[in-house]
A protein has these predicted regions:
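Helix-to-loop junction immediately C-terminal to a conserved catalytic motif
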Residues: 53
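Catalytic Walker B motif of ABC-type/P-loop ATPase nucleotide-binding domains
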Residues: 163-166
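Conserved ABC ATPase "signature" region
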Residues: 117-134
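Conserved beta-strand-loop-alpha-helix hinge in the C-terminal portion
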Residues: 215-239
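Conserved ABC ATPase signature
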Residues: 138-142, 146
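Conserved ABC transporter NBD signature motif
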Residues: 61-72, 82
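H-loop/switch region of ABC-family ATPase nucleotide-binding domains
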Residues: 195-196
């Protein structure tokens, strides 16, 4: 479903120096896999998620989705179907909330992609996410965790095939995090999450992609095998987070 091969990403800073964020990254993700993306701050996790969502494009290497090479040139022709297929929940939910009410947030994607029975779908989605009493509320009045629910509800409502999530538990209390994990298992779609929370990672998925602090792919395999390998954990600088 997703194939990344020899992918590089860099940018030039204000001093004219090249800053490398991803170097020679290769992996494949099959349909309905649940993958945890691990690594210290600055290792390139958020950048990789942005590439998978085509918010930025590789400088070298390839990103292939369903047999289509995803690159800047020609992306406009496939952007509509791609945006319907792949949803991205950013760490800051405010980046996804721009409508007057929670109802309008959930409606937006449904209208954009031509769904039928929009009102019914909004009501069902609101109930699923515990948002019924907030439907007429402006999102900016809500707490961080509630905003996260609204943003996720608006993405799930359009029935994506792939869900990307950057630190999804950052604004959530433990009970809501447990609810989120249950929801993701129930959705049964391809899901990739980045997280620093190794306890959450173990509850979420079996497979891990681990980025090193020099922006390469350090590990691709079973999460339980990575967590048992103290040498790799130390190299990833994640050993202190597990215990």
């Amino acid at each position: 479903m997703i194939e990344v091969e020899n992918l590089y990403f860099d940018y030039t800073d204000f001093k004219g120096e090249k800053i490398e964020l991803l170097k020679d990254i290769s992996f494949k993700i099959e349909s309905k896999e649940r993958v945890v993306l691990l690594g210290v701050n600055g290792s390139g996790k958020s950048t990789l998620l942005k590439i998978l969502n085509a918010l930025v494009f590789p400088k070298r290497g390839s990103y292939i989705y369903k047999g289509m090479r995803i690159r800047k040139r020609g992306f406009k022709k496939i952007s509509r179907s791609f945006r319907k297929d792949i949803s991205f929940l950013m760490q800051d939910p405010n980046m996804l909330l721009f409508n007057a009410t929670v109802r309008e947030e959930i409606e937006f994607g449904l209208r954009e992609f031509g769904f039928d029975d929009i009102e019914k779908r909004v009501e069902e989605t609101a109930k699923r996410f515990g948002l019924e009493k907030y439907l007429e509320t402006p999102p900016f009045y809500l707490s961080g965790g509630e905003k996260q629910r609204v943003a996720l509800a608006s993405l799930v409502a359009i029935e994506p095939e792939v869900l990307l999530m950057d630190e999804p538990s950052a604004n959530l209390d433990p009970p809501t995090t447990e609810w989120l994990m249950d929801l993701l298992r129930e959705l049964d779609i391809t899901t990739v999450i980045s997280t620093h929370n190794l306890a959450l990672a173990q509850k979420f998925g079996d497979r891990a992609l681990v980025l090193s602090d020099n922006h390469t792919l350090l590990f691709d395999g079973l999460l339980k095998e990575f967590l048992k390998n103290e040498e790799l954990m130390g190299e990833a600088k994640l050993l202190h987070r597990y215990g």
